[in-house]
Structure formats: C-alpha cells, structure tokens
Amino acid sequence: MPDRDSYANGTGSSGGGPGGGGSEEASGAGTGSGGATSDAICRDFLRNVCKRGKRCRYRHPDMSEVSNLGVSKNEFIFCHDFQNKECSRPNCRFIHGSKEDEDGYKKTGELPPRLRQKVAAGLGLSPADLPNGKEEVPICRDFLKGDCQRGAKCKFRHLQRDFEFDARGGGGTGGGGSTGSAPPGRRHDLYDIYDLPERGFEDHEPGPKRRRGGCCPPDGPHFESYECNLAPLRGVECRLLEEENALLRKRVEELKKQVSNLLATNEVLLEQNAQFRNQAKVMTLSSTAPATEQTLAPTVGTVATFNHGIAQTHTTLSSQALQPRPVSQQELVAPTGAPAAPPTNAAPPAAPPPPPPHLNPEITPLSAALAQTIAQGMAPPPVSMAPVAVSVAPVAPVAVSMAQPLAGITMSHTTTPMVTYPIASQSMRITAMPH
C-alpha cells in the first residue's frame, strides 16, 4: 500500500488507496528476479496482477513471510492538498479529510463513519463492505472491475457490485472460495454519503456542467478515486469562476460597443440613402422640364402665328373696306322691278360694271384664306348676319328693300370714330379667336 512518507525516501509507490496499482518501478530500487534479497516487495504481486514472473525486479514474498497482509493493503492515503485548501483535482484519488481524521486513522486504523461512507461511495460499495481494520482481508479490486482471472485462488475478497458477496474468509488464501454465504449487504443510500449539513452544500448553487478533467488510464488504478463527483467548491474553483465571469463581462462590453458602432453606421447609411433619393428626384424633374418646354413652344408659336395671320387678314379687310367709293343716288333709290336709268353724264357702257363690294376679286382670296385658316384651327359654330335696313339722311326718303343686300353699313358713335364693315348677302362663318 502506498505511503506518503515513503515518497520522500524514493521507495513509495505511485498507486493510491487500497491495492494501489503502481508498477514495480514505484516499489523502490533493487535488481534480480523473484528471489531478490532487496526489501522492496512487488506490490503487483501482492495484488496477484504481476505478469512479469521471474523477470520482475522486486521480491515476490511467500504468504508465510507476510505476517500481516492487510497492513499493506488496507491503508488509505489522505489528500494533503485538500487539507491545505488547494486541491483542484475533480477526481482526486485520495481521501479528503481533515488532519485530525488522518491522525485518528493512523492511531486506530479505522476511518471515521463519515469518511467510510465517502470511500464506499467512490468504490461503489456499501460502508459495511469496507474492512473495519488493517487486519482484515482486503477487497479484490480487479473483481470489482471484472478483470480478476484468479477465481477461487484469489487471496482477496470478492464482493459483487450489487452487494451480493461471499462470506468473509479468514486467513489469506481462501477469501474468494470460502464456503457458506452471508446475507446480502444492503444497498447504500446515495443521499447519506454527501453529508450535506457538515459540508455546507446547501449554501452553494449548483455549478455549471464542465468537461471532465484528465481521467485515469484504462489500465490504471482508476478505482481508487474515492470522490469522483463529490469534490466541494473550494477556493481554486471559485477563483476560476471569478476569472471566467470577468472575461465574460469584458466580452459583453465589447459586444455592446460593436452594437453601438453598427447603429451609428446604420444611421449614416440611412442619411446617405435619403440624399441619393432626393438627388435622383431632382435630376428627373430637371430632365423632364426641357422636354415640356420644347413641346409647348411649337404650340405657342403656332397659336401666335395663327393669331397674327387672323389679325393681318382682318386688317387688310378693314383697310379695303374703309376705302371711299362713290355711291350714286340711283343705286340707292332704284326700285327692284324697274331698271335704273343711266345717268346723263355716265360713260358709255363699254366695260362691264364693277362687281359689288362683296364680290371684289381682291377681297375674295383673302376671305377664302381666312375661312380656311379658321376651319383648320377649330370647328366654330356658324354665325349669320342678317341684312339691316339703313336710311341715309341727306338723301330724300327712299324705300330700301329688306331683301336686297346693301353694299356697306355705316355705323356712327358719339365717342368713337366711324368704321365701315362690309356685309355680304350670303352667310359667312366667323369664329371668335381668343386673344
């Protein structure tokens, strides 16, 4: 069984707990075969797992030479790091107990009831299955793992994992093959092993799940880890949690800064997007305005030209109509039924009489052009002017026929100059144009 005092002398074993599974190199110096004179005893041989035989460097004692086999097999090792409040191993192989518990174990060879429950829980056994002292035959650890090939020849007690075990045999040879059977041991209560009031687990919140640390190798003595999942929350773990919380807080602050930067960038991009949209609208309006002006310009020009043509034609007609023409009294007084007598001073009828004013060849083309221009511009409503009866003051009372058209109409106004307009006997389409 490994002892911490032997580590300082270089003769201790690396295995911890009952049946430490260290190799023969940990047993101390010495050469030779199984009959070597060195005091270093092969601990694998004590566990009946040494496969080196005569090639083993350490001594393989006979059972008669080992006066007290339990002294080497039933010794438990206490964790000194736990006593110094610095044990950070999640699966510590040693017993976590106080210095007083260790001193009491060294004096009496028995563990306190509280520690017995923890050790039994780490081995998957009931506290009643643990040896009560160093004089008892130790438990076969290989059988607990299902690797014991010795059967009835095994020197250690074979206990079932479901706590149906054989009777405890005396001596060192018939532990596994003794006759008779004892009643099966009771199943241990999982809630009894935690010792909550004494350990103070009620004051702590359950810790987060973490990846399990370095486990023991499959061929190593992993059965000696007494407190696999019962490691208390100590100072080292508290410091690790505080450091992790500090790192997480820094990470949160960095993420908040990134979020604020992204929000500011988003606002700038939104402003630029709005500016680009306004510029696109201004460019569209400016490109549409010249086209509208070009479309309206010919229309205005056409209307202006049209109005100018109408005004010019009207001016020509007015100027021609205002030209004085001698009108004889016979033309005004002549009856409709009798032909007018030729005047005495009239010229011989060598040439045909001039046409009436409404049939003047100079005015006719202008009137036709005016009518064509008005008809092309828009469809006006027809306006007819009826002949008007006019009487001439200086002439004697003459009956003027209402049916006969007159050559001209003289209109007078007190405030405006006299203007003469020609009147035709036929209907004339006149359209009022907007000025």
Curated annotation (Swiss-Prot):
Compositional bias (Pro residues): 340-359
Annotated segments matching region Disordered: 1-36, 166-190, 315-363
UniProt record, GO biological process: negative regulation of miRNA processing; post-transcriptional regulation of gene expression
Top-rank lineage group of the source organism: Eukaryota
PANTHER family in the record: MUSCLEBLIND-LIKE PROTEIN (PTHR12675), ZINC FINGER CCCH DOMAIN-CONTAINING PROTEIN 10 (PTHR12675:SF6)
Stretches annotated zinc finger (C3H1-type): 36-63, 73-99, 134-161
Gene Ontology molecular function terms on file: miRNA binding; zinc ion binding
The protein, known as: Zinc finger CCCH domain-containing protein 10
Gly residues composition bias: residue spans: 12-35, 168-179
SMART domains, A to Z: ZnF_C3H1 (SM00356)
Described function: Specific regulator of miRNA biogenesis. Binds, via the C3H1-type zinc finger domains, to the binding motif 5'-GCAGCGC-3' on microRNA pri-MIR143 and negatively regulates the processing to mature microRNA.
Signal peptide span: none
Source organism of the structure: Mus musculus (Mouse)
Record key words, sorted: Coiled coil, Metal-binding, Methylation, Nucleus, Repeat, RNA-binding, Zinc, Zinc-finger
GO cellular component terms listed in the entry, alphabetical order: nucleus
Pfam annotation, one family: zf-CCCH_2
